[in-house]
Amino acid sequence: MSGRGKQGGKARAKAKTRSSRAGLQFPVGRVHRLLRKGNYAERVGAGAPVYLAAVLEYLTAEILELAGNAARDNKKTRIIPRHLQLAIRNDEELNKLLGKVTIAQGGVLPNIQAVLLPKKTESHHKAK
């Protein structure tokens, strides 16, 4: 009889995510879904979510690296909002990109105007 089912057929290939194909950690499929549901355009190309996920991943990695350095400088092992604030505000390009962004519990950059600092007086007077 010929009704033996799928014995000799090809096995289905193991599913591979679009994120792994692109070599990314950020979810390409989720970004694609959000682009479609967000009414940004009538149609969304196949490369757009990959590109956007890559950009978001790069920016996140950049901020986290600088924040990790700030945490290490403060002898801490956990990144807190203060470290994110210091990382962003001390980097010229990130500060320009996120200039209007307020980070909760971030504090401010330490800055004292030069005119407010005590004047240096000449301590070594020549003996007459």
Swiss-Prot record:
GO cellular component: extracellular exosome; nucleosome; nucleus
Superkingdom assignment: Eukaryota
List of residues that carry Citrulline: R4
Modified residues (N6-glutaryllysine): K96, K100, K119, K120, K126
InterPro entries in alphabetical order: Histone-fold, Histone_H2A, Histone_H2A/H2B/H3, Histone_H2A_C, Histone_H2A_CS
SUPFAM superfamilies noted in UniProt: Histone-fold
Chain positions with N6-succinyllysine modification: K10, K96
Modified residues (Phosphoserine): S2
GO molecular function: DNA binding; protein heterodimerization activity; structural constituent of chromatin
Compartments, as annotated in UniProt: Nucleus; Chromosome
Residues recorded with modification N6-lactoyllysine: K10
Keywords carried by this UniProt record: Acetylation, Chromosome, Citrullination, DNA-binding, Hydroxylation, Isopeptide bond, Methylation, Nucleosome core, Nucleus, Phosphoprotein, Ubl conjugation
Cross-link (Glycyl lysine isopeptide (Lys-Gly) (interchain with G-Cter in ubiquitin)): K14, K16, K120
Residues bearing PTM N6-(2-hydroxyisobutyryl)lysine: K6, K10, K37, K75, K76, K96, K119
Modified residues (Symmetric dimethylarginine): R4
UniProt modified residues of type N6-(beta-hydroxybutyryl)lysine: K10, K14, K37, K96, K119
Function: Core component of nucleosome. Nucleosomes wrap and compact DNA into chromatin, limiting DNA accessibility to the cellular machineries which require DNA as a template. Histones thereby play a central role in transcription regulation, DNA repair, DNA replication and chromosomal stability. DNA accessibility is regulated via a complex set of post-translational modifications of histones, also called histone code, and nucleosome remodeling.
Family indicated by similarity: Belongs to the histone H2A family.
The protein's assembly and partners: The nucleosome is a histone octamer containing two molecules each of H2A, H2B, H3 and H4 assembled in one H3-H4 heterotetramer and two H2A-H2B heterodimers. The octamer wraps approximately 147 bp of DNA.
Record protein name field: Histone H2A type 1-H
Organism: Homo sapiens
Taxonomic path: Eukaryota, Metazoa, Chordata, Craniata, Vertebrata
